[in-house]
Amino acid sequence: SAIPRGLLLLAGLCCLVFGIMAEDAQVAQGPSQQIPRSLAHFAHSMYRVLTQQSNTSNIFFSPVSIATALAMVSLGAKGDTHTQILWGLEFNLTEIAEADIHDGFQNLLHTLNRPHSEHELTTGNGLFLDQKLKLKEKFSEDVKTLYHAEAFPTNFSNPKEAEKQINAYVEKGTQGKIVDLVKDLSADTVLALVNYIFFRGKWEKPFDVKHTTQEDFLVDMNTTVNVPMMKRQGMYKAFHCSTIQSWVLLLDYEGNVTTLFLLPDKGKMQHLEETLTPELIFKFARKTERMFANVHLPKLSISGTYDLKEVLGHLGITNVFSGAADLSGITEDMPLKISKGLHKALLTIDEKGTEAAGATELEITPHSVPQDLFFNKPFLFLIIDHSTDTPLFVGKVMDPTKK
């Protein structure tokens, strides 16, 4: 069973657990435009759902991780179950042949998983299958070929053993960052689908640890927390955008990954969230003009853990989690539904990016007053792979002291 290794993330993981059920659904056809565009729209829709659930919490998730897991499931889905997944992933079924979607994911995963000396970015897909279950030949071949998925026979009649096996796979793939993801597997589980993404990058322009000091971060009108604030002065890709009433700062990692930070003007977070579009994000990511700036950015570790059944239900993906699921393309031994869908992503932002950077870069700076960019209040960020325009992670920092 061939598999190139998983997606290296600042650690994002998606786990879908399938259980047995009775019943089925009806018939469907094809999906949308190129993968990155659909992923950007999917990320946007999912972000909106998460902010509606709570506009005071940190948010962090990996759109590419969740979409990859769902696209794999769609290979074995039929009827409305199939249509809902592809529409929910923002594929316009009149604009792209379904085969092109899966080929697109295959190319994307291949590009993301290319070995880089500058950063680590790895994705992985694991199928944990009850020993009593036989996968359909076509599904088994397709997930291996298109999604580089590995299949593992699993004894689900011993849930504790099965949990241990799945968690060990995830822990290894995320280099120990995500542990004990799966707890309390239900007794009717027969299939678990796990996708992880792991990213570790180094800033192209690292911050100097000596300049990091404790400073206030204004969570809201009534709450201030103390955080280690990193500082660096230099030439940055940064500008103010009046459409979203926010400062935009691009910080590059070595290699071709960039973080796009969005700092709303005073009281304008809601305006930013309402006006930001995938098209604007693509436009920002291509900006190259630089300005002399004084950047203050909090050191932080942020994570998000989401129940996908709940979140994706808001995007119209409901059948696959219910008695209406038709996953007969995966196996005909028994009717399946996803009994549990989990996504966990985590990220650390520090002076080095993540790994120590020994070199110090000297740059020529103008004799002018630098623009202050103080990330000392809630902000948004996106981590984007430049070679493919793919949104790897999306985050919102409301309180950097909350893990």
From Swiss-Prot:
GO cellular component assignments: extracellular space
Location relative to the cell: Secreted
Family of the protein in this entry: Belongs to the serpin family.
Chief location of this protein within or outside the cell: secreted
Gene3D superfamilies according to UniProt: Alpha-1-antitrypsin, domain 1 (2.30.39.10), Antithrombin, subunit I, domain 2 (3.30.497.10), Serpins superfamily (2.10.310.10)
Swiss-Prot/TrEMBL site (Reactive bond) positions: H367, S368
Name of the protein: Alpha-1-antiproteinase F
PROSITE patterns to which the protein is assigned, alphabetical: SERPIN (PS00284)
Pfam families named among the record's database cross-references: Serpin (PF00079)
Glycan-linked positions: N55, N92, N155, N222, N256
Swiss-Prot/TrEMBL keywords: Acute phase, Glycoprotein, Protease inhibitor, Secreted, Serine protease inhibitor, Signal
Lineage: Eukaryota, Metazoa, Chordata, Craniata, Vertebrata
